[in-house]
Amino acid sequence: MNQPFCSPVKALRSVLDAAALLPSPSPETIPLEAACGRIAAADLCARMDQPPFDRSPLDGYALHSADTAGASRETPVTLPVVMKLYAGDAPAAALPAGCAARIMTGAPLPEGADCILMQELTDSGEETVQLYAAVKPLQNVVFRGEDVAAGAVIAPAGTVLTPAHLGVLAGQGYAEVTVCRPLTVGILSTGSELLAPGAPWAPGKIYDANGIQNAARLRQLGFAVERQQCSDDPEVITGKMQELLTRCDAVITSGGVSVGQKDYLPLVLEKLGAQLVVEGVAQKPGSPMLAATLGGKLVFCLSGNPFAAAATLEQYAIPALLRAAGRREESCIPARTVCTLTNGFSKPSKGNRYLRATACGGKVTLPGAGNTEAHSSGALSAMMGCNCLVEIPAGSGPVEPGTEVEVLCFVQ
């Protein structure tokens, strides 16, 4: 690493720009019911007005407003009821002047009628009806296209489809939608000290927590994952990287990325001809992170320390992968907000520092009652329940409870 570490802002911009230059994910058409959480591959537009006709929002009577003039409980207006309309009916004829139509919620407004009087302001008659209030033109009418106009964009390309999107699309008659094919991410945990979960423990060994945690987080966001593990051997690492790059759209490694005697990832990337995008970030934890492109695919090399890996995964790898997967950029980036810190952090921060935390209701709490031990980059358990990172700017002293702090919320 010959260049000075770049700022967190520059690192994020660099990986997003690199992701935007990669080939677009291929589209696939799937059933609407299976599309929740998927990314729209093209604009999804309204095929028709919604509602498709003027309709009633309540049970009552469709009327000519002019026929209701002067109506009150003291001087009711009486009209013949000439038709009854339920949701799903199509009016067979126009409503003549001087007549009423019994109408139920959701039923189409008959031609000629220009208002609806709720049944609570009538005697609820079936053959004739007494009106106890005057009604203005267009009162109590839900108009055609009032919710969605034909041709309107319901979900722009790159939108993550939610249950609400699916409901609107179903109301437009969509049975299938075209979405981006999910990217497959290769996860490679490096380290001769690693054991696969379930293997017998041996002295000097640790279980591969990073691989499981990183893979789970990516699956949570809709990625397919292939997970591998290997020893600190540059030839083995190179072979595993090539293998994963053959089958996957991106690769994330953990471990072997710093300046130790067995930190081989920088050499492996150089050997494979990768184009470095980020060569270290000026922050703690996770400063040794590398980001590169190789054969039109993203590669992120993260620290082997669990929290350092988790933090840089959230800050840089996930935004870039989501961008490459077809998401709109604004939905790829951790949202920033300001919260009140409920407990303090006693260490000064010479450089940019990120602390795992839990934000809720405008307040943010550090794990371990703010004890600095809970924020070791090697601490695993302190990540449980966390949903954000607290940003402590370079040059800050100890942070006291009650301080307003910048918070980066994990992308969902």
Describe the role of every protein-language-model region.
Residues 2-6, 62-228, 373-374, 389, ...:
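Short, glycine/charged-enriched hinge/interface segments at domain edges or termini
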Residues 4, 8-12, 28, 32, ...:
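Generic structural signal for well-ordered, non-membrane alpha-helical segments
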Residues 9, 28-33, 37, 42, ...:
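Flexible glycine/proline-rich
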Residues 15, 60, 151, 187, ...:
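Residue-level signal for inorganic ion chemistry
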